[in-house]
């Protein structure tokens, strides 16, 4: 491996094991057993070793490797290694044999069988993959969804895939959503918009926005999301609903004036008792121009909430069209200066400098004069105020 990069010194290193090599590693056995136990299958040298074993075994290779794969008495990692060898070195198992492997007691073997069906799609394998969506193991269900995405063998009935959206395994829910996005939208649009399970509805509507990001669709999703937020939702689901609104607003290029009811609803929620909610609420409020949160946002800046959360809120305030009075403008600028001076991150200090400069565009002439008089204390604000001075600058 190597180190260095980006103008730093580095080097090339090799790691060598100097301990005693276990007997099971030194003695891999002979014949097909050595091929099954061969370490580092993905390396070139390991594949060369296996290719040599295959040449030695000749016509017996296929039967011996298949025997390892299909025997329930073998450990699952031996069986899946045998399936890998059949894929890499042949003979590739027939569709019937792969379907038989998909019914094995071992979850690992069933998942590997689903992987192989994704590589070699056929009519029977498509039906079997749809059946395996109801497997009792999440790893198998994930492998099935990935195989469907790879091969295009999608289910025709959305009800086969929708329950997986609510699974606790986030990776499974993700790949299931990707499968749903590939299916014809007209088959599942109404189901996700009206689904009783909020989790299925949230992820289903995210799939809908990705599959059909039209303005009409995004407005429907925003309307349904607004309804969901009036019902009981867990904190995690509420946060995801807010994020769904952000995606819908962005993908549909929705003008804030089209969703004034959502704007007012978001404004009423801020500040929430959960910091994750506040992160999403302040972003939405800034985009939707929810000026009614201005006073509460200023109170939030002076609260005892974590500084990163307050800084995010302060950085979003610059996007509000609220007509700040002089006292409020100075309070916001004071926070920018304080956060920039207190942070140990040079990057954040530079971000806050840019935010101060942008916010300074709203300063009045009186504000500019007052800030420049205190330039030694309010350095970033003074720099922003300079941009407001008339050109050329006179001595006064």
Model segments located where?
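Long, ordered, helix-rich scaffold segments
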Residues: 2-11, 15-396
